[in-house]
């Protein structure tokens, strides 16, 4: 609720000052506070001091050793601390999580200042218009970076929060190692882990669209995952027998056979729970299962088995027939 209020403060700031993009945060900050760019001996992005202190003007300090786009975000964040009436005293924005005051109140104020900064630099109506006008998420990301004056990761996280279910992003460094990944709310597929390699990209080959752009030494990938996938298997036969056949061909160890079946049933149980949550078609359920199976490398022997698609199609038809 308070986060919503923080966003409204940023919206009001836009209309009150008739701001244009990229927002001149330096000019704006000077209307509310003393502003200094400084070097810090510790790992800190910025400070908002003298907040709501009688007779004192608030002061904003920004770490000048950070990249320009990051300084802009920090500045927008500190303006948030200054204008939100319940943010009081002195707030230090420490980058190193181990040194952060972990109190709930501090974390809430940080989330509010971030929500304020996000809305100030990348207004909701602007992002929504970009999403309406363009299909290519790489194009949209690059427009946000350029016209919003933000970092590619800030633009990516902004899109993540606004996209509907079914989108996943990956950031890969020059050594082809994943440094960041995430998904829009409600997406079935789980993002790969930090440190995973290019195999994670291959596992998303079922995506209906892929958008890529590079920024510095990083490559950004957006995947649009299909709402529905055509059932590929012939689904002749009983899915239980098919699963039995598959696990027996993979291993003769009965304990391992049981473990495989439990893992497969875990994914299918999830699919079953989706049926209870809302309307599903055979094809949408198949897509949900493909998304859940695709990045589970422990199940590779199963999912790469020639009878797996038959098994999955048969199981899904069985699930649907029971509705
Ligand atoms: Zn802060």
Labelled PLM ranges:
Residues 1-323:
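Active-site hotspot residues in diverse enzymes, especially metal/ion-binding acidic/histidine motifs
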């Amino acid at each position: 609720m308070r986060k919503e209020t923080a966003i409204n403060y940023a919206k009001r700031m836009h209309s009150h000052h008739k701001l244009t993009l990229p927002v001149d945060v330096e000019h704006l900050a000077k209307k509310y506070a003393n502003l200094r760019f400084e070097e810090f001996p510790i790992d800190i992005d910025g400070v908002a001091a003298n907040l709501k202190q009688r007779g004192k003007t608030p002061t904003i300090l920004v770490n000048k050793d950070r990249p320009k786009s990051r300084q802009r975000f920090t500045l927008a964040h500190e303006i948030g601390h200054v204008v939100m009436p319940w943010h009081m005293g002195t707030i230090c924005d420490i980058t190193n999580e181990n040194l952060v005051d972990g109190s709930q109140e501090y974390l809430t104020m940080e989330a509010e200042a971030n929500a304020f900064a996000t809305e100030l630099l990348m207004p909701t109506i602007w992002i929504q218009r970009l999403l309406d006008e363009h299909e290519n998420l790489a194009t949209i990301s690059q427009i946000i970076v350029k016209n919003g004056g933000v970092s590619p990761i800030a633009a990516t996280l902004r899109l993540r929060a606004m996209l509907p279910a079914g989108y996943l992003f990956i950031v890969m460094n020059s050594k082809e190692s994943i440094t960041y990944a995430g998904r829009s709310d409600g997406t079935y597929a789980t993002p790969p882990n930090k440190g995973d390699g290019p195999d994670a990209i291959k596992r998303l080959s079922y995506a209906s669209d892929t958008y890529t752009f590079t920024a510095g030494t990083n490559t950004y990938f957006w995947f649009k995952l299909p709402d529905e996938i055509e059932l590929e298997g012939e689904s002749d036969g009983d899915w239980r027998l098919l699963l039995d056949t598959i696990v027996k061909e993979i291993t003769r160890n009965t304990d391992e056979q049981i473990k495989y079946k439990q893992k497969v049933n875990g994914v299918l149980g999830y699919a079953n729970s989706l049926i209870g949550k809302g309307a599903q078609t055979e094809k949408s359920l198949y897509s949900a299962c493909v998304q859940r199976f695709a990045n589970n490398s422990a199940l590779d022997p199963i999912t790469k088995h020639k009878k797996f698609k038959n098994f999955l199609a048969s199981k899904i038809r069985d699930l649907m027939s029971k509705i």
